[in-house]
Protein backbone atom coordinates (compact mmCIF):
# COMPACT_ATOMS: atom_id res chain seq x y z
CA UNK A 1 0.00 0.00 0.00
CA UNK A 2 2.83 2.35 0.95
CA UNK A 3 4.61 1.64 -2.34
CA UNK A 4 1.41 2.40 -4.21
CA UNK A 5 1.06 5.79 -2.46
CA UNK A 6 4.70 6.68 -3.19
CA UNK A 7 4.27 5.63 -6.82
CA UNK A 8 1.17 7.80 -7.22
CA UNK A 9 2.93 10.76 -5.63
CA UNK A 10 5.91 10.43 -7.99
CA UNK A 11 3.60 10.19 -11.00
CA UNK A 12 1.78 13.35 -9.92
CA UNK A 13 5.09 15.20 -9.45
CA UNK A 14 6.27 14.14 -12.89
CA UNK A 15 3.03 15.31 -14.54
CA UNK A 16 3.12 18.61 -12.65
CA UNK A 17 6.74 19.20 -13.68
CA UNK A 18 5.90 18.72 -17.34
CA UNK A 19 2.95 21.13 -17.30
CA UNK A 20 3.24 24.49 -19.13
CA UNK A 21 3.56 27.35 -16.68
CA UNK A 22 3.05 31.11 -16.81
CA UNK A 23 5.65 33.57 -15.56
CA UNK A 24 4.30 36.81 -14.19
CA UNK A 25 5.86 40.20 -14.73
CA UNK A 26 5.72 42.77 -11.98
CA UNK A 27 6.25 45.57 -14.48
CA UNK A 28 6.66 45.86 -18.26
CA UNK A 29 7.54 48.76 -20.51
CA UNK A 30 5.54 49.64 -23.63
CA UNK A 31 8.33 48.26 -25.81
CA UNK A 32 8.71 44.99 -23.87
CA UNK A 33 11.43 43.50 -21.73
CA UNK A 34 13.23 40.17 -21.48
CA UNK A 35 13.97 38.32 -18.30
CA UNK A 36 15.80 35.00 -17.80
CA UNK A 37 15.31 32.73 -14.85
CA UNK A 38 17.40 29.64 -14.02
CA UNK A 39 15.92 26.66 -12.18
CA UNK A 40 17.99 24.05 -10.40
CA UNK A 41 18.25 20.51 -11.68
CA UNK A 42 15.17 18.52 -10.62
CA UNK A 43 15.54 16.01 -7.83
CA UNK A 44 14.74 13.11 -10.15
CA UNK A 45 17.24 12.87 -13.05
CA UNK A 46 14.63 11.33 -15.30
CA UNK A 47 11.83 13.78 -14.41
CA UNK A 48 11.81 15.23 -17.93
CA UNK A 49 12.18 11.89 -19.67
CA UNK A 50 14.66 11.28 -22.46
CA UNK A 51 15.70 14.08 -24.79
CA UNK A 52 14.72 16.95 -22.47
CA UNK A 53 11.83 19.36 -22.85
CA UNK A 54 11.43 22.33 -25.20
CA UNK A 55 7.93 23.71 -25.09
CA UNK A 56 6.50 27.10 -26.00
CA UNK A 57 3.96 28.43 -23.58
CA UNK A 58 1.70 31.41 -23.09
CA UNK A 59 -0.97 32.64 -20.71
CA UNK A 60 -4.17 34.47 -21.55
CA UNK A 61 -4.45 36.73 -18.51
CA UNK A 62 -3.14 40.29 -18.65
CA UNK A 63 -0.26 39.81 -16.22
CA UNK A 64 1.27 36.78 -17.88
CA UNK A 65 4.09 36.74 -20.38
CA UNK A 66 4.64 34.89 -23.62
CA UNK A 67 7.89 32.94 -23.70
CA UNK A 68 9.75 29.67 -24.09
CA UNK A 69 10.52 26.97 -21.53
CA UNK A 70 13.65 24.92 -22.23
CA UNK A 71 14.98 22.14 -20.02
CA UNK A 72 17.50 19.31 -20.13
CA UNK A 73 18.86 16.93 -17.52
CA UNK A 74 21.05 19.66 -16.01
CA UNK A 75 18.84 22.72 -15.75
CA UNK A 76 15.69 24.48 -16.84
CA UNK A 77 15.75 28.00 -18.32
CA UNK A 78 12.78 30.29 -18.80
CA UNK A 79 13.09 33.08 -21.36
CA UNK A 80 10.07 35.34 -21.30
CA UNK A 81 9.22 38.60 -23.01
CA UNK A 82 6.31 40.93 -22.37
CA UNK A 83 4.35 41.80 -25.50
CA UNK A 84 2.34 44.88 -24.58
CA UNK A 85 1.32 45.87 -28.09
CA UNK A 86 2.14 46.03 -31.79
CA UNK A 87 3.58 49.21 -33.32
CA UNK A 88 2.10 50.62 -36.53
CA UNK A 89 3.93 53.29 -38.56
CA UNK A 90 2.57 53.85 -42.06
CA UNK A 91 5.39 56.28 -42.86
CA UNK A 92 8.48 54.39 -41.68
CA UNK A 93 7.25 50.87 -40.91
CA UNK A 94 7.82 47.64 -42.83
CA UNK A 95 5.57 44.59 -42.79
CA UNK A 96 8.67 42.38 -42.68
CA UNK A 97 9.28 43.66 -39.12
CA UNK A 98 8.02 42.00 -35.95
CA UNK A 99 6.13 45.11 -34.76
CA UNK A 100 7.30 44.70 -31.16
CA UNK A 101 9.01 48.11 -30.86
CA UNK A 102 8.64 51.52 -32.46
CA UNK A 103 11.86 50.93 -34.41
CA UNK A 104 10.51 47.64 -35.77
CA UNK A 105 6.98 48.88 -36.52
CA UNK A 106 4.90 47.41 -39.32
CA UNK A 107 3.40 49.49 -42.12
CA UNK A 108 -0.17 48.23 -42.58
CA UNK A 109 -3.05 47.82 -40.16
CA UNK A 110 -3.72 44.37 -41.60
CA UNK A 111 -0.25 43.21 -40.55
CA UNK A 112 -0.53 44.90 -37.15
CA UNK A 113 -3.81 43.09 -36.48
CA UNK A 114 -2.30 39.77 -37.59
CA UNK A 115 0.68 40.17 -35.25
CA UNK A 116 -1.54 41.30 -32.39
CA UNK A 117 -3.54 38.09 -32.73
CA UNK A 118 -0.38 35.99 -32.94
CA UNK A 119 1.13 37.61 -29.84
CA UNK A 120 -2.02 37.61 -27.75
CA UNK A 121 -2.29 41.39 -27.35
CA UNK A 122 -5.24 43.72 -27.93
CA UNK A 123 -3.24 46.95 -28.25
CA UNK A 124 -1.84 48.65 -31.35
CA UNK A 125 0.35 51.75 -31.00
CA UNK A 126 -0.01 54.24 -33.86
CA UNK A 127 3.30 56.08 -34.35
CA UNK A 128 2.48 58.14 -37.47
CA UNK A 129 -0.64 59.53 -39.10
CA UNK A 130 -2.55 56.80 -40.96
CA UNK A 131 -3.72 58.00 -44.37
CA UNK A 132 -6.79 56.46 -45.99
CA UNK A 133 -6.67 56.73 -49.78
CA UNK A 134 -9.25 54.17 -50.88
CA UNK A 135 -11.91 52.03 -49.22
CA UNK A 136 -10.93 50.56 -45.85
CA UNK A 137 -12.98 48.49 -43.40
CA UNK A 138 -11.52 48.18 -39.92
CA UNK A 139 -13.01 45.37 -37.84
CA UNK A 140 -10.45 44.55 -35.14
CA UNK A 141 -12.51 42.45 -32.75
CA UNK A 142 -12.39 45.05 -29.99
CA UNK A 143 -8.69 45.92 -30.12
CA UNK A 144 -7.54 49.43 -29.18
CA UNK A 145 -5.45 51.73 -31.37
CA UNK A 146 -3.47 54.14 -29.16
CA UNK A 147 -1.82 57.44 -30.08
CA UNK A 148 1.92 56.83 -29.51
CA UNK A 149 4.26 59.86 -29.52
CA UNK A 150 2.14 61.23 -32.34
CA UNK A 151 1.15 64.86 -32.72
CA UNK A 152 -1.46 66.15 -35.15
CA UNK A 153 -4.19 63.90 -36.53
CA UNK A 154 -4.32 60.14 -36.01
CA UNK A 155 -6.21 59.21 -39.19
CA UNK A 156 -6.66 61.28 -42.34
CA UNK A 157 -8.95 60.71 -45.32
CA UNK A 158 -6.96 62.13 -48.22
CA UNK A 159 -9.71 62.99 -50.71
CA UNK A 160 -13.33 62.48 -51.71
CA UNK A 161 -12.67 58.90 -52.87
CA UNK A 162 -11.54 57.80 -49.40
CA UNK A 163 -13.95 55.70 -47.34
CA UNK A 164 -13.45 54.41 -43.79
CA UNK A 165 -15.76 52.00 -41.95
CA UNK A 166 -15.07 51.26 -38.28
CA UNK A 167 -16.50 48.28 -36.38
CA UNK A 168 -15.40 46.74 -33.07
CA UNK A 169 -12.35 48.96 -32.74
CA UNK A 170 -11.44 51.51 -30.06
CA UNK A 171 -9.38 54.50 -31.17
CA UNK A 172 -7.94 56.17 -28.08
CA UNK A 173 -6.55 59.66 -28.61
CA UNK A 174 -4.94 59.90 -25.17
CA UNK A 175 -1.17 60.24 -25.62
CA UNK A 176 0.28 56.88 -24.59
CA UNK A 177 3.85 58.00 -23.96
CA UNK A 178 4.67 61.68 -24.29
CA UNK A 179 5.73 64.46 -21.93
CA UNK A 180 2.83 66.63 -20.76
CA UNK A 181 4.36 69.74 -22.30
CA UNK A 182 4.12 68.14 -25.75
CA UNK A 183 0.49 67.09 -25.43
CA UNK A 184 -0.77 70.34 -26.99
CA UNK A 185 0.55 69.18 -30.37
CA UNK A 186 -2.23 66.62 -30.78
CA UNK A 187 -5.30 67.14 -32.96
CA UNK A 188 -8.41 65.27 -34.20
CA UNK A 189 -8.70 61.49 -34.12
CA UNK A 190 -10.08 61.52 -37.68
CA UNK A 191 -9.62 64.35 -40.17
CA UNK A 192 -11.46 64.48 -43.49
CA UNK A 193 -10.90 67.90 -45.06
CA UNK A 194 -11.49 67.08 -48.73
CA UNK A 195 -14.65 65.01 -48.70
CA UNK A 196 -14.92 61.26 -48.20
CA UNK A 197 -17.14 58.85 -46.29
CA UNK A 198 -17.00 57.73 -42.65
CA UNK A 199 -19.23 55.02 -41.18
CA UNK A 200 -19.26 54.17 -37.47
CA UNK A 201 -20.79 50.76 -36.71
CA UNK A 202 -21.32 48.78 -33.52
CA UNK A 203 -18.24 48.69 -31.30
CA UNK A 204 -16.56 51.67 -32.96
CA UNK A 205 -15.35 53.99 -30.19
CA UNK A 206 -13.51 57.32 -30.54
CA UNK A 207 -12.38 58.54 -27.13
CA UNK A 208 -10.11 60.55 -24.83
CA UNK A 209 -8.67 62.93 -27.41
CA UNK A 210 -7.54 66.53 -26.87
CA UNK A 211 -7.49 68.58 -30.06
CA UNK A 212 -5.75 71.91 -30.50
CA UNK A 213 -8.60 73.25 -32.65
CA UNK A 214 -11.73 71.88 -34.32
CA UNK A 215 -13.48 68.52 -34.13
CA UNK A 216 -11.61 66.56 -31.49
CA UNK A 217 -13.31 63.28 -32.37
CA UNK A 218 -13.97 63.88 -36.08
CA UNK A 219 -13.18 66.93 -38.21
CA UNK A 220 -15.28 66.66 -41.38
CA UNK A 221 -15.37 69.50 -43.92
CA UNK A 222 -15.98 70.03 -47.63
CA UNK A 223 -18.67 67.48 -48.37
CA UNK A 224 -17.85 64.63 -45.99
CA UNK A 225 -20.62 62.09 -45.32
CA UNK A 226 -20.79 60.49 -41.86
CA UNK A 227 -23.15 57.75 -40.67
CA UNK A 228 -23.39 56.51 -37.07
CA UNK A 229 -25.18 53.30 -36.09
CA UNK A 230 -26.26 51.57 -32.86
CA UNK A 231 -23.34 50.60 -30.63
CA UNK A 232 -20.96 53.29 -31.86
CA UNK A 233 -19.63 55.80 -29.31
CA UNK A 234 -17.83 59.16 -29.41
CA UNK A 235 -16.88 60.14 -25.85
CA UNK A 236 -14.64 62.20 -23.59
CA UNK A 237 -13.03 64.33 -26.29
CA UNK A 238 -12.00 67.95 -25.75
CA UNK A 239 -10.96 71.00 -27.77
CA UNK A 240 -8.31 72.78 -25.73
CA UNK A 241 -8.32 76.16 -27.48
CA UNK A 242 -12.03 76.86 -27.02
CA UNK A 243 -12.92 75.91 -30.58
CA UNK A 244 -15.90 74.09 -32.13
CA UNK A 245 -17.04 70.47 -32.08
CA UNK A 246 -15.83 68.42 -29.13
CA UNK A 247 -17.26 65.20 -30.59
CA UNK A 248 -17.76 66.07 -34.27
CA UNK A 249 -17.36 69.20 -36.35
CA UNK A 250 -19.18 69.33 -39.71
CA UNK A 251 -18.25 72.11 -42.10
CA UNK A 252 -18.77 73.36 -45.65
CA UNK A 253 -21.59 71.18 -46.91
CA UNK A 254 -20.89 67.99 -44.95
CA UNK A 255 -23.66 65.68 -43.72
CA UNK A 256 -24.10 63.56 -40.59
CA UNK A 257 -26.82 60.92 -40.25
CA UNK A 258 -27.13 59.58 -36.71
CA UNK A 259 -29.23 56.42 -36.68
CA UNK A 260 -27.99 55.25 -33.29
CA UNK A 261 -25.03 55.25 -30.96
CA UNK A 262 -23.94 57.75 -28.35
CA UNK A 263 -22.07 61.07 -28.28
CA UNK A 264 -21.27 61.87 -24.65
CA UNK A 265 -18.88 63.62 -22.29
CA UNK A 266 -17.29 65.84 -24.94
CA UNK A 267 -16.34 69.50 -24.42
CA UNK A 268 -15.77 72.50 -26.71
CA UNK A 269 -16.37 76.23 -26.91
CA UNK A 270 -19.33 75.65 -29.25
CA UNK A 271 -21.03 72.35 -29.97
CA UNK A 272 -19.68 70.19 -27.17
CA UNK A 273 -21.27 67.16 -28.82
CA UNK A 274 -21.65 68.24 -32.46
CA UNK A 275 -20.95 71.54 -34.24
CA UNK A 276 -22.77 71.96 -37.57
CA UNK A 277 -21.22 74.79 -39.60
CA UNK A 278 -22.81 75.29 -43.00
CA UNK A 279 -23.72 71.60 -42.99
CA UNK A 280 -26.57 69.20 -42.24
CA UNK A 281 -27.32 66.70 -39.47
CA UNK A 282 -30.27 64.31 -39.34
CA UNK A 283 -30.82 62.52 -36.02
CA UNK A 284 -32.98 59.40 -36.33
CA UNK A 285 -31.87 57.69 -33.13
CA UNK A 286 -29.15 57.41 -30.53
CA UNK A 287 -28.26 59.76 -27.71
CA UNK A 288 -26.35 63.02 -27.31
CA UNK A 289 -25.75 63.42 -23.58
CA UNK A 290 -23.59 65.00 -20.88
CA UNK A 291 -21.60 67.19 -23.25
CA UNK A 292 -20.57 70.69 -22.20
CA UNK A 293 -19.09 74.02 -23.28
CA UNK A 294 -16.34 76.06 -21.67
CA UNK A 295 -17.08 79.28 -19.84
CA UNK A 296 -14.69 81.76 -21.48
CA UNK A 297 -13.63 85.37 -21.01
CA UNK A 298 -14.44 87.69 -23.91
CA UNK A 299 -15.84 84.87 -26.05
CA UNK A 300 -19.23 83.23 -25.71
CA UNK A 301 -19.78 79.50 -25.45
CA UNK A 302 -22.95 77.87 -26.73
CA UNK A 303 -24.68 74.71 -27.85
CA UNK A 304 -23.49 72.08 -25.39
CA UNK A 305 -25.29 69.26 -27.20
CA UNK A 306 -25.54 70.56 -30.77
CA UNK A 307 -24.48 73.92 -32.21
CA UNK A 308 -25.87 74.96 -35.61
CA UNK A 309 -24.55 77.95 -37.60
CA UNK A 310 -24.72 79.08 -41.22
CA UNK A 311 -21.07 80.00 -41.03
CA UNK A 312 -18.37 80.60 -38.46
CA UNK A 313 -16.02 83.52 -38.27
CA UNK A 314 -13.13 81.18 -37.67
CA UNK A 315 -10.19 79.66 -39.47
CA UNK A 316 -7.01 77.94 -38.45
CA UNK A 317 -4.24 76.12 -40.27
CA UNK A 318 -5.78 74.73 -43.45
CA UNK A 319 -9.35 75.01 -42.08
CA UNK A 320 -11.57 77.75 -43.53
CA UNK A 321 -15.33 77.84 -43.06
CA UNK A 322 -17.49 79.25 -45.85
CA UNK A 323 -21.00 80.73 -45.52
CA UNK A 324 -23.49 77.94 -46.29
CA UNK A 325 -26.96 77.02 -45.01
CA UNK A 326 -26.94 74.83 -41.90
CA UNK A 327 -29.69 72.58 -40.57
CA UNK A 328 -30.46 70.08 -37.82
CA UNK A 329 -33.39 67.67 -38.11
CA UNK A 330 -34.40 65.44 -35.21
CA UNK A 331 -36.69 62.50 -35.98
CA UNK A 332 -35.78 60.31 -33.02
CA UNK A 333 -33.26 59.70 -30.27
CA UNK A 334 -32.51 61.75 -27.15
CA UNK A 335 -30.60 64.92 -26.31
CA UNK A 336 -30.21 65.09 -22.56
CA UNK A 337 -27.99 66.21 -19.70
CA UNK A 338 -25.85 68.64 -21.71
CA UNK A 339 -24.64 71.86 -20.09
CA UNK A 340 -23.73 75.19 -21.71
CA UNK A 341 -21.89 77.39 -19.23
CA UNK A 342 -22.28 80.74 -20.97
CA UNK A 343 -24.71 81.81 -23.72
CA UNK A 344 -27.13 78.92 -23.44
CA UNK A 345 -28.32 76.13 -25.65
CA UNK A 346 -27.86 73.21 -23.31
CA UNK A 347 -29.42 70.91 -25.91
CA UNK A 348 -29.40 72.64 -29.31
CA UNK A 349 -28.28 76.17 -30.15
CA UNK A 350 -29.00 77.79 -33.52
CA UNK A 351 -26.88 80.80 -34.50
CA UNK A 352 -27.58 82.81 -37.65
What are these regions (language model features)?
Residues 26, 31-42, 46-110:
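Right-handed parallel beta-helix/beta-solenoid
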Residues 121, 148-154, 174-187, 210-216, ...:
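Short glycine/acidic-rich loop motifs that flank beta-strands on beta-rich extracellular proteins
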Residues 86-90, 107-131, 136-141:
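Glycine-rich repeat segments that build the extracellular carbohydrate-interaction surface of secreted
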Residues 115-117, 130-141, 146-168, 172-199, ...:
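Extracellular beta-strand-rich solenoid/capping regions of secreted or surface-exposed proteins
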Residues 3-16:
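Sec-dependent N-terminal signal peptides
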Residues 16-25:
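C-terminal segment of classical bacterial N-terminal signal peptides
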Residues 140-144, 163-175, 197-210, 225-238, ...:
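Right-handed parallel beta-helix
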Residues 203-204, 215-217, 231-232, 245-247, ...:
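Periodic glycine anchor positions in long extracellular repeat architectures
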Amino acid sequence: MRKRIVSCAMAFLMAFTLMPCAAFAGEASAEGQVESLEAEKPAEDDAFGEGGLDEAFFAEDEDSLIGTLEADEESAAFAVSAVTGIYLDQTHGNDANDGLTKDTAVRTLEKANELANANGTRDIFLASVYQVTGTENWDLGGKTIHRYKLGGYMIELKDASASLTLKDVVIDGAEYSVAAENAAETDSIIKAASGGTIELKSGAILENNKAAQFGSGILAINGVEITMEDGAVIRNNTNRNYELGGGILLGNGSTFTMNGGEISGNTANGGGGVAIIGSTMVMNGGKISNNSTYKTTGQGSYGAGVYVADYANASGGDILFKPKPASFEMNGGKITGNKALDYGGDGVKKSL
